[in-house]
Amino acid sequence: MRVLTRFMLSAADARQFPAAGAPEIAFLGRSNVGKSSLINAIVGSKIAKTSSTPGRTQTINFFEIRRPGKPRPDWIFADLPGYGYARVPKELTAEWPKFIDPYLHERPTLALCVSIVDVSVPPQKKDLELLNWLRHVGRPFVVVGTKIDRVSGNQLRNNLLKLKEELLVEEVVPFSAKGTTGHNELWKKIFEAAGTDAPATAG
């Protein structure tokens, strides 16, 4: 789906969050899981910076996303810092900047959390911890599996099944940042969660 994008700001503190407006879609995932590549793929432009250094981003980056012809943004995309890269095991929230918790817990316009997992590796404890926390605070989420191009067909099906079992979810949306697999499905989830009038085909 063609959209117009605009970088808003990078927030390193809760006081820097933009004023609540359009429905917000938060993108979360372990460091180096392909989060920025996913965001860039669905909007069709390189708005989210990719880094070869996992865990480098320590701000929430906000972007306006607008369909052509719309006077105001349809959504705000929030690119959150990656988690789970610390060498020493810690609690999930201890690895994130302190402002992440109030954003996920208190942000009034947060419509959907996109939890991004790597299908080419076994299910990770940190991903389950995140989903359990989102369940606890009542935030709607969808789990999206990236890096499907690294896994063969049969292995992909097995890995997706194992992810569903380990993460206690009914669906993991397989997604390719290099192709188009999963793009329509993810846009559909965003439209539904945000209450946006969807076109006949989202992508």
Curated annotation (Swiss-Prot):
GTP binds at residues 29-36, 55-59, 79-82, 146-149, 175-177. One of its GO terms (biological process) is division septum assembly. PROSITE patterns: G_ENGB. Residues 21-196 form the EngB-type G domain. GO terms for molecular function: GTP binding; metal ion binding. It comes from the Bacteria. InterPro entries: G_ENGB_dom, GTP-bd, GTP-bd_ribosome_bio_YsxC, P-loop_NTPase, Small_GTP-bd. Mg(2+) binds at S36, T57. Keywords: Cell cycle, Cell division, GTP-binding, Magnesium, Metal-binding, Nucleotide-binding, Septation. Its cofactor is Mg(2+). PANTHER family: ENGB-TYPE G DOMAIN-CONTAINING PROTEIN, MSS1/TRME-RELATED GTP-BINDING PROTEIN. Necessary for normal cell division and for the maintenance of normal septation. Belongs to the TRAFAC class TrmE-Era-EngA-EngB-Septin-like GTPase superfamily. EngB GTPase family. This is Probable GTP-binding protein EngB. It comes from Koribacter versatilis (strain Ellin345).
